[in-house]
């Protein structure tokens, strides 16, 4: 029995989800340029296959980062991103245009998003607390740039929309490759801009009725697996909150297969709920942060397999810890590297204090969260 059929049977007797204003899609939508990414059609059954989907932490652009060329920022993790079938990044900034700015109201150059795409990120998450830093006009321009990049860079985005119809198309975002059909749900607890709720364009909020509607649409579109990517939790806390576990339990009961969260800017603990993996927060990917535990983050690689009978299942997720070194530490720029590759490479560091800070933080976060790589 396939996972989709099993989910349908198991859903009998569960609490019914709220109705949604979005009508069922008669044909699953697919971006035309994804045809190039998917390649030639292959038989659904008759051959074994594996799909990899890698999620990296918060991609930020503080004011000081703008003083440096982007090149080294993600170069150390780009090979892992590029080798994945899909790589996902939380774009924690707007593309609101000039004047460019960092914290507390982020507006990055368009070239920064293009750089992320060059590094292998092909799905941008936009539901975060900073997406309205430049108001509705800033969000509208951000969406406009990402829509252009869909055509020019063959990327996708989710987490925000220009109107209700666009929301139904992007929430969930359906991605397809190798005969797998994956649904992505990206939403945020809120934004830093008050008074804009209910206006368009809009970001997707952490509202159970909306989430349930997105899960319904994922099932209508015959999703093999549903992945939730929430922006939630308490900043700088290494353990999940009560509200996180309550929502996680509810989402798993509703049909979500795996949860990978962001927002706290640190790695949080993980768990399984009914056998489904939950990563409450994977921390930062690149930023100017240097407070305790904010320089370490994770990439989580999700693997989905299909056997020769056509049966699909999720394999054990793979975790890789990363370290974001600031200028003058590892090199003269920002540089995110994979920790395990650098544990015995003290000679690479310009400033040895950062090397030892990386080793201490790596050990402490693993022991505190229980998340091992």
For the regions a protein language model found, what residue spans apply to each?
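Bacterial N-terminal signal peptides
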Residues: 11-19
């Amino acid at each position: 029995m396939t996972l989709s059929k099993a989910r349908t049977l198991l859903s009998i007797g569960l609490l019914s989800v709220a109705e949604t204003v979005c009508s069922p899609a008669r044909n699953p939508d697919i971006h035309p340029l994804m045809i190039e990414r998917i390649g030639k059609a292959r038989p659904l059954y008759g051959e074994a296959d594996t799909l990899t989907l890698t999620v990296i932490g918060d991609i930020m652009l503080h004011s000081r980062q703008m003083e440096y060329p982007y090149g080294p920022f993600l170069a150390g993790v780009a090979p892992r991103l590029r080798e994945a079938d899909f790589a996902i990044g939380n774009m924690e900034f707007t593309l609101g245009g000039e004047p460019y700015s960092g914290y507390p109201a982020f507006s990055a150059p368009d070239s920064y998003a293009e750089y992320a795409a060059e590094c292998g990120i092909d799905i941008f998450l936009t539901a975060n607390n900073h997406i309205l830093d430049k108001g509705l006009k800033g969000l509208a321009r951000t969406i406009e740039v990402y829509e252009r990049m869909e055509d020019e860079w063959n990327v996708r985005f989710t987490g925000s929309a220009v109107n209700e119809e666009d929301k139904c198309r992007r929430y969930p975002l359906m991605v397809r490759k190798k005969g797998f059909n994956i649904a992505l749900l990206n939403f945020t607890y809120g934004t830093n801009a008050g008074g804009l709720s209910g206006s368009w364009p809009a970001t997707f909020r952490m509202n159970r009725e909306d989430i349930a509607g997105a899960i319904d649409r994922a099932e209508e579109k015959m999703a093999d697996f549903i992945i939730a990517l929430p922006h939630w939790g308490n900043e700088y806390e290494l353990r999940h909150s009560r509200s996180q576990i309550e929502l996680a339990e509810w989402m798993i009961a509703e049909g979500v297969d795996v949860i990978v969260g962001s927002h706290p800017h640190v790695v949080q603990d993980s768990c399984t709920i009914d056998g489904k993996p939950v990563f409450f927060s994977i921390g930062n990917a690149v930023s100017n942060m240097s407070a305790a535990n904010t320089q370490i983050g994770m990439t989580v690689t999700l693997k989905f397999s299909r056997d020769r009978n056509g049966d699909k299942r999720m394999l054990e997720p793979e975790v890789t810890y990363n370290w974001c070194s600031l200028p003058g530490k590892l090199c003269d720029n920002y540089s995110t590297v994979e920790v395990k590759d650098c544990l015995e490479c003290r000679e690479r560091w310009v400033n040895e204090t950062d090397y030892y800070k990386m080793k201490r933080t790596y050990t402490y976060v693993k022991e505190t969260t229980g998340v091992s790589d």
